[in-house]
Design a protein with these regions (language model features):
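C-terminal motif of bacterial Sec signal peptides marking the signal peptidase cleavage site
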Residues: 29-30
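N-terminal secretory signal peptides that target proteins for export/translocation
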Residues: 1-14
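Residue-level signal for mature regions of secreted extracellular proteins and peptides
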Residues: 24-25, 489
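Cytosolic catalytic domains that perform sulfur/thiol-centered chemistry
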Residues: 33-498
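A periodicity- and composition-biased signal for non-globular, repetitive helical segments
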Residues: 9-10, 23, 395
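Sec-dependent signal peptide recognition
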Residues: 15-22
């Protein structure tokens, strides 16, 4: 038997109250009848606690040097490396495992392992994403399924309940900060506790001399032993609410494209102003655009708005009510693309402008103003094109600020696909009466020619829900089945009927 305690508040379907128990049996609270949030079906007891975004979030110390998880500094890592058994955080009894997304520069290639209780593995972002079906559409770059995660734990011999896992960039860059975030997100989503998980602040080119000296680096990484025995099924936190499905996002959008203060949500687009506006406005330097003297500029005469499109999409723009501030503002390029201080991130999220004038803007392309961004009690929804850039805004929100945060993992590559607009075959991607049309709740500009629009893999345009990824993850933890990777997986029946 599995006992499941749902401590989450909210009314979304995609992972908030709906949980697939053993054999897809119905929870009374989700399917009607009864008053409890636990499955008491018999047998040995296994309690899985469903965590709300507010419980998953963690607030960083004002000074990152004081953190022992979440955002950690090179100085903290140095203390651990010098005497791991003596200096490891309270509650950690296992190994120190560093996942580097890339090789660092010459002389600082890898955080130096001792291969006894400190290990460093090269683990690119491709290991932490997977093409998945949500029951409606096949979407790239989603959180990996259970079998994929277990294969990673086996490959690197990770004990996620006892080891300290540090996601690092290697060479610091915007792309590697995204990869670092994907590592953190996948592990946290699957139930690794905050105390066991950290992100190293800054790339190797900067931390070499700023917290670590040259002796702390090695030219080679540890060899993956492929001897791990622990499964994500042993992790008893259900953190699937960290992911927002397209259904969840549709359910929280306002009735028009405006910033609604006090509605309990802040939706943050991590992309450029050009992508947010579908080319109606640009940022200085965007697409080689020369600065206009401000932070939001009208495009030059004759500008081709299709330059803002990605992944051969049918349209470009944003969901109604979204605020935009590009992810790069969260990082300090002079410090190996480390996160900026917490106070600066708090100011950005409040709506305040920085010294250069960059701030959250709304659908009018005007700054919302200090105090009109994040509101206490809001849940922050973050996205970009494939939720790589949004890993940085999401970490800023969830790991630094400690705000309840959900990652729309399907992102704009999924959102813009769910449209009654033609692809290169001339056929609309979704039928006019599909309930999953996101074009009806979006500002957008259609692709200039359907010939540029790639075909999408639609699984079921009339699916009852779009939470197959969530259900599969919850079911896998209970010992049922695998995942939706690869192609066109058949949507499982609704365990509650209908």
């Amino acid at each position: 038997m599995m006992r499941r305690q749902d401590k989450r508040a909210g009314n979304g379907i995609g992972g908030w109250r709906f949980w697939a128990a053993a054999g897809f049996s119905c929870l009374l609270a989700a399917c009607g009848g009864g008053s409890g949030g636990e499955d008491r079906s018999g047998g040995s007891v296994k309690t899985i606690i469903a965590r709300a975004p507010a419980e998953i979030a963690q607030s960083s110390a004002a000074d990152y040097e004081d953190n022992v998880n979440g955002i950690v500094t090179a100085a903290r890592l140095n203390a651990w490396m010098s005497n791991w058994t003596g200096n490891r955080p309270a509650g950690i009894t296992g190994k120190l495992i560093v996942f580097q997304a890339t090789v660092g520069p010459a002389g600082a290639e890898y955080i130096k392992p001792n291969n006894l209780n400190v290990f460093t593995y090269l683990s690119p972002s491709s290991e932490w994403v997977q093409t998945r079906s949500n029951g409606v559409i096949l979407t790239p770059s989603m959180v990996p399924d259970g079998p994929t995660m277990d294969a990673l734990l086996k490959k690197y011999d990770v004990d996620p309940q006892n080891d300290m896992i540090v996601c690092a960039m290697g060479t610091g860059s915007t792309g590697n900060a995204m990869a670092q975030g994907r590592c953190w997100y996948a592990l946290r989503y699957w139930g690794v506790q905050a105390k066991n998980l950290a992100l190293l602040n800054g790339g190797n080119q900067w931390i070499n001399g700023n917290g670590l000296d040259a002796s702390r680096f090695a030219a080679t990484a540890s060899n993956a032993p492929n001897t791990g025995l622990v499964s994500v099924k042993s992790l008893l936190d259900d953190n699937t609410s960290l992911q927002a499905t397209v259904e969840d996002l549709l359910n929280v959008l306002p009735a028009r494209d405006q910033n609604v203060v006090g509605d309990g949500v802040m939706i943050w687009d991590a992309r450029s102003t050009g992508q947010f506006s579908a080319g109606e406005r640009l940022e200085p330097g965007e697409n080689s655009f020369t600065a206009c003297g401000g932070t939001v500029c009208a495009p030059p005469s004759g500008y081709d708005y299709m330059r803002t499109f990605q992944n051969n999409g049918s349209r470009q723009g944003h969901p109604w009510g979204t605020l935009q501030l590009q992810f790069t503002r969260m990082l300090d390029s002079t410090k190996g693309y480390a996160y900026k201080p917490k106070a600066e991130i708090a100011a950005y999220m409040s709506g305040a402008a920085d010294s250069a004038g960059y701030a959250l803007i709304d659908g009018s392309y005007q700054p919302v103003g200090a105090g009109a961004g994040y509101q206490p009690g809001d849940t922050v929804y973050v996205y970009c094109e494939t939720t790589f850039r949004a890993m940085i805004t999401g970490v800023a929100s969830a790991v630094i600020m400690g705000y309840p945060t959900r990652f729309y993992d399907g992102a704009m590559v999924e959102w813009s696909s769910l449209s009654h607009l033609p692809d290169a075959t001339g056929t609309p991607i979704l039928p006019a009466n599909s309930p999953w049309r996101t074009d009806v709740k979006s500002f957008f500009r259609q692709a200039a020619s359907a010939t540029s629009v790639a075909t999408r893999t639609i699984i079921n345009p009339y699916a009852t829900h779009a939470n197959q990824v969530i259900l599969e993850g919850q079911s896998y933890k209970q010992g049922n089945g695998g995942g939706s990777g690869g192609g066109g997986t058949v949507t499982p029946g609704n365990p509650c009927g209908g």
